[in-house]
Amino acid sequence: MRLSKNFTLKELTRSNTATRLGIDNEPSKEGILKLTLLATELLQPLRNAVGSLRITSGYRSPQLSEAIGSSSNSQHCRYEAVDMQFVKRGKMDNIKIYDALIDLDLDFDQCILEFGNATEHIDPTEPDWIHLSWKVVDNRRQTLVAYKDENNKTKYRPIINYNCI
């Protein structure tokens, strides 16, 4: 089922973990509508601007979220979030997603630059992936960096230099 010109329902619900563990990761009718809005309002404009985007994680059922050690309260479980990467000519360049999001002035709830070379004091120029979410109402336009502290715990902080990575 096509959700937008370049995104399908399968792409936003695919999970090797769910398949391997026999977990049902099928969205509800309401979920399909929300994923369609996510695809048309946020993902497709980004795709139009930067080219091919690789969705590495989209909708997660609460059971799948638990199986991978994530929160059942995650925006992924509410049909509002994807993790994605941008690869061009075999080279990952995920910061392009962030740059396009800001340049296009798209509405979004959260943009998290996940790990890569991020630290407590340094914004990543090479995040491993981008977590991006969109809600029907009350989007926060929150930009965060995820990094590991000295105890290998995941921490989040605001992006230090919002427009100048």
Place the predicted regions along the sequence by residue.
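Extracytoplasmic cell-surface/polysaccharide-interacting catalytic and binding patches
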Residues: 1-47, 148-165
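Amphipathic alpha-helical interface surfaces
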Residues: 38-42, 64, 80, 93, ...
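Extended, low-complexity, intrinsically disordered C-terminal regulatory tails
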Residues: 43-68
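Catalytic cores and adjacent binding grooves of peptidoglycan-active enzymes
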Residues: 86-165
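Short, surface-exposed glycine/acidic/tryptophan-bearing loops
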Residues: 62-82
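Structural recognition of the beta-strand scaffold that forms the well-ordered cores
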Residues: 54-56, 81-85, 131
